[in-house]
Amino acid sequence: MSLAIVYSRASMGVQAPLVTIEVHLSNGKPGFTLVGLPEKTVKEAQDRVRSALMNAQFKYPAKRITVNLAPADLPKEGGRFDLPIAIGILAASDQLDASHLKQFEFVAELALTGQLRGVHGVIPAILAAQKSKRELIIAKQNANEASLVSDQNTYFAQTLLDVVQFLNGQEKLPLATEIVKESAVNFSGKNTLDLTDIIGQQHAKRALTIAAAGQHNLLFLGPPGTGKTMLASRLTGLLPEMTDLEAIETASVTSLVQNELNFHNWKQRPFRAPHHSASMPALVGGGTIPKPGEISLATNGVLFLDELPEFERKVLDALRQPLESGEIIISRANAKIQFPARFQLVAAMNPSPTGHYTGTHNRTSPQQIMRYLNRLSGPFLDRFDLSIEVPLLPQGSLQNTGDRGETSAQVREKVLKVREIQMERAGKINAYLNSKEIERDCKLNDKDAFFLEKALNKLGLSVRAYHRILKVSRTIADLQGEQQIFQPHLAEALGYRAMVRLLQKLSNM
């Protein structure tokens, strides 16, 4: 047989489109031609495959070899096609049994010795192979992450020779499901960060509890050293473990940039904290071959932006659309790549360049403070459901070893109960309610509606802010076991508008 057809998977975001690899051997001057829009790393497969075949004691055909990667208009990159190209050459030269090739897909890079190396984006390939009712063969290096999602359809091998002997029926390859799934163990209780580590700041802890219960975006505002970063880092310890679907979605994104997933706690929600010097591609994704950014790596978890005004304004404004849609689409000349970006945004900032806007520590004028705060656009600040001031601790607080409030485990138990209520009522968490669902689940009596409208007019808030206040009020009512939203719930939600009050105060000075 001079023609062989082998199947593999490309990597396009969290999608893994099918690639059909056609290998043809013909008479003529020996050579190797690769067609089908390959990137440079794919073109280099010629040398890797030749050396791998020879070092695995196979014959490299002294013929004209033509390899077509179809569809031709699909960009291909990386070394993920090395193994299927090698299998195609062996099948076309009758060095292996090709009768069962149509039921397999292959994704792995080849070392010059014939060893298989892992590649990025294996989890999307596994999920796609499952839908196609084919079995996938990968490198042992990817076996741990494959064990998280594979369903008796993924084999792993160490060498090219192992794969050939398996296809010839001479030996068996282990299934990825045979790896001990340490991920099944619940590690959430081993989080060493606890709310009781933080002295005081009970008001901020209350806001953190509300944010965790309703998955609301949260902004901490206050001088340096008051515990803003510590508070934010405790949030993931208050959140429930991810569901299987959420964990698979997050793992699919993570596998695009890592060969090894942390399968010990793969169901724990991610916490991403990029530095304020992060560029647009680093935060939202990008590159010639688009890769996920921090917002996608934080999918189903928390994105924490410390020193918020120090980020470039255009970078922060790029978050506005993903915060609403839960996804980011990166357009290139030859493709549009979509990544998930459903994350909870938590940010911390100082109220002025010196860190203070009142008291003896303040060394800036109201005009300087306003210029500093104007680095943040109004539409971006509108995306925060809660903004709360985290003040300096009162004198004597550091020596106080008394009650520090509820532990993270106690708060987490409350959060789990409240989220169950929300899922039973609307099938989603409060933060994701749309306008119709807000009208249905956040009804107010006439007196309370008038109270809220009066407050909105006084604070000059937008319709988006109105909806966010109602959703926060709904979460507060859920925490208190109330079916109806009442004025105290609205008043507390309005109290979490520290940034609005600060801007009003500065404009009146």
UniProtKB/Swiss-Prot annotation:
Residues at which ATP binds: 222-229
Positions of transmembrane segments: none
Pfam families noted in UniProt: ChlI (PF13541), Mg_chelatase (PF01078), Mg_chelatase_C (PF13335)
Alphabetic keyword roster: ATP-binding, Competence, Nucleotide-binding
InterPro entries (alphabetical): AAA+_ATPase, CHLI-like, MCM_dom, Mg_chelat-rel, Mg_chelat-rel_C, Mg_chelatse_chII-like_cat_dom, P-loop_NTPase, Ribosomal_Su5_D2-typ_SF
A biological process from GO: establishment of competence for transformation
GO terms for MF: ATP binding; ATP hydrolysis activity; DNA binding
Signal peptide limits: none
Family: Belongs to the Mg-chelatase subunits D/I family. ComM subfamily.
Function: Induced during competence development. Not needed for DNA uptake. May be involved in a recombination step.
Name this polypeptide is given: Competence protein ComM
Record organism: Haemophilus influenzae (strain ATCC 51907 / DSM 11121 / KW20 / Rd)
